[in-house]
Protein backbone atom coordinates (compact mmCIF):
# COMPACT_ATOMS: atom_id res chain seq x y z
CA UNK A 1 0.00 0.00 0.00
CA UNK A 2 1.05 3.56 -0.64
CA UNK A 3 -0.06 6.90 0.75
CA UNK A 4 -0.34 9.55 -1.93
CA UNK A 5 -0.23 13.12 -0.70
CA UNK A 6 -0.98 15.86 -3.21
CA UNK A 7 -0.79 19.62 -2.68
CA UNK A 8 -3.13 21.21 -5.23
CA UNK A 9 -4.85 24.50 -5.98
CA UNK A 10 -8.13 24.72 -4.02
CA UNK A 11 -10.31 25.31 -7.08
CA UNK A 12 -9.14 21.98 -8.55
CA UNK A 13 -10.33 19.87 -5.60
CA UNK A 14 -13.77 18.91 -6.94
CA UNK A 15 -12.34 17.88 -10.31
CA UNK A 16 -9.59 15.80 -8.69
CA UNK A 17 -12.06 14.14 -6.31
CA UNK A 18 -14.32 13.21 -9.23
CA UNK A 19 -11.36 11.91 -11.24
CA UNK A 20 -10.22 9.71 -8.34
CA UNK A 21 -13.77 8.47 -7.83
CA UNK A 22 -13.88 7.45 -11.50
CA UNK A 23 -10.97 5.05 -10.92
CA UNK A 24 -12.51 3.57 -7.77
CA UNK A 25 -10.91 5.67 -5.04
CA UNK A 26 -13.59 6.82 -2.63
CA UNK A 27 -11.88 7.54 0.68
CA UNK A 28 -9.63 10.55 1.10
CA UNK A 29 -8.62 13.17 3.62
CA UNK A 30 -8.57 16.85 2.72
CA UNK A 31 -6.79 19.59 4.66
CA UNK A 32 -6.64 23.30 3.88
CA UNK A 33 -2.98 24.30 4.04
CA UNK A 34 -0.76 27.24 3.10
CA UNK A 35 2.69 27.08 1.59
CA UNK A 36 5.11 28.10 -1.11
CA UNK A 37 7.62 26.47 -3.41
CA UNK A 38 10.46 27.79 -5.54
CA UNK A 39 8.60 30.96 -6.51
CA UNK A 40 8.34 31.95 -2.81
CA UNK A 41 4.93 33.59 -3.06
CA UNK A 42 4.09 36.84 -4.80
CA UNK A 43 3.40 40.51 -4.11
CA UNK A 44 -0.03 42.12 -3.87
CA UNK A 45 -1.11 45.74 -3.79
CA UNK A 46 -3.42 46.69 -0.90
CA UNK A 47 -4.49 50.30 -0.25
CA UNK A 48 -1.54 51.61 -2.19
CA UNK A 49 1.06 49.55 -0.36
CA UNK A 50 2.80 46.49 -1.74
CA UNK A 51 2.79 43.38 0.44
CA UNK A 52 4.63 40.10 0.06
CA UNK A 53 2.31 37.09 0.20
CA UNK A 54 4.60 34.26 1.27
CA UNK A 55 2.14 31.46 1.94
CA UNK A 56 -0.42 30.64 -0.74
CA UNK A 57 -3.60 28.66 -0.03
CA UNK A 58 -3.48 25.02 -1.11
CA UNK A 59 -5.42 21.85 -0.44
CA UNK A 60 -3.61 18.76 0.80
CA UNK A 61 -5.30 15.61 -0.44
CA UNK A 62 -4.31 12.28 1.13
CA UNK A 63 -5.29 8.82 -0.11
CA UNK A 64 -4.04 5.35 0.72
CA UNK A 65 -4.25 2.95 -2.21
CA UNK A 66 -3.16 -0.58 -3.10
CA UNK A 67 0.17 -0.71 -4.96
CA UNK A 68 -1.54 -1.56 -8.25
CA UNK A 69 -3.53 1.72 -8.22
CA UNK A 70 -0.62 4.08 -7.45
CA UNK A 71 0.31 5.03 -11.03
CA UNK A 72 -3.32 5.38 -12.08
CA UNK A 73 -4.01 7.61 -9.07
CA UNK A 74 -0.99 9.82 -9.78
CA UNK A 75 -1.97 10.17 -13.45
CA UNK A 76 -5.52 11.12 -12.49
CA UNK A 77 -4.30 13.83 -10.10
CA UNK A 78 -1.81 15.27 -12.60
CA UNK A 79 -4.27 15.28 -15.52
CA UNK A 80 -6.95 16.96 -13.43
CA UNK A 81 -4.94 19.39 -11.25
CA UNK A 82 -2.46 20.61 -13.86
CA UNK A 83 -3.00 24.14 -15.19
CA UNK A 84 0.50 24.62 -16.60
CA UNK A 85 1.07 27.62 -14.35
CA UNK A 86 3.35 28.12 -11.37
CA UNK A 87 1.90 26.70 -8.17
CA UNK A 88 0.13 23.64 -9.57
CA UNK A 89 1.46 21.70 -6.59
CA UNK A 90 3.36 18.56 -5.71
CA UNK A 91 2.68 14.85 -5.23
CA UNK A 92 4.48 12.73 -2.64
CA UNK A 93 4.27 8.94 -2.37
CA UNK A 94 4.96 7.08 0.88
CA UNK A 95 5.04 3.41 1.78
CA UNK A 96 2.31 2.37 4.24
CA UNK A 97 3.33 -0.60 6.33
CA UNK A 98 -0.02 -1.26 7.96
CA UNK A 99 -3.56 0.13 7.99
CA UNK A 100 -6.26 -0.73 10.53
CA UNK A 101 -9.96 0.21 10.47
CA UNK A 102 -10.70 1.08 14.08
CA UNK A 103 -14.40 0.14 14.00
CA UNK A 104 -14.00 -3.40 12.64
CA UNK A 105 -10.37 -4.25 13.17
CA UNK A 106 -9.92 -4.96 9.45
CA UNK A 107 -6.35 -4.56 8.32
CA UNK A 108 -4.35 -3.42 5.31
CA UNK A 109 -6.24 -3.34 1.98
CA UNK A 110 -9.48 -4.43 3.70
CA UNK A 111 -9.16 -1.35 5.91
CA UNK A 112 -8.83 1.10 3.04
Curated annotation (Swiss-Prot):
P-II indirectly controls the transcription of the glutamine synthetase gene (GlnA). P-II prevents NR-II-catalyzed conversion of NR-I to NR-I-phosphate, the transcriptional activator of GlnA. When P-II is uridylylated to P-II-UMP, these events are reversed. When the ratio of Gln to 2-ketoglutarate decreases, P-II is uridylylated to P-II-UMP, which causes the deadenylation of glutamine synthetase by GlnE, so activating the enzyme. The keyword Nucleotide-binding applies. Homotrimer. Belongs to the P(II) protein family. GO terms for molecular function: ATP binding; enzyme regulator activity. One of its GO terms (biological process) is regulation of nitrogen utilization. It comes from the Bacteria. This is Nitrogen regulatory protein P-II. It holds the Pfam family P-II. Uridylylated/deuridylylated by GlnD. The lineage of its organism: Bacteria, Pseudomonadati, Pseudomonadota, Gammaproteobacteria, Pasteurellales. The keyword Transcription applies. PROSITE patterns: PII_GLNB_CTER (PS00638), PII_GLNB_DOM (PS51343), PII_GLNB_UMP (PS00496). The modification O-UMP-tyrosine is found at residue 51. InterPro entries: N-reg_PII, N-reg_PII-like_a/b, N-reg_PII/ATP_PRibTrfase_C, N-reg_PII_CS, N-reg_PII_urydylation_site. Keywords: Nucleotide-binding, Phosphoprotein, Transcription, Transcription regulation. It comes from Haemophilus influenzae (strain ATCC 51907 / DSM 11121 / KW20 / Rd). The gene is glnB. One of its GO terms (cellular component) is cytosol.
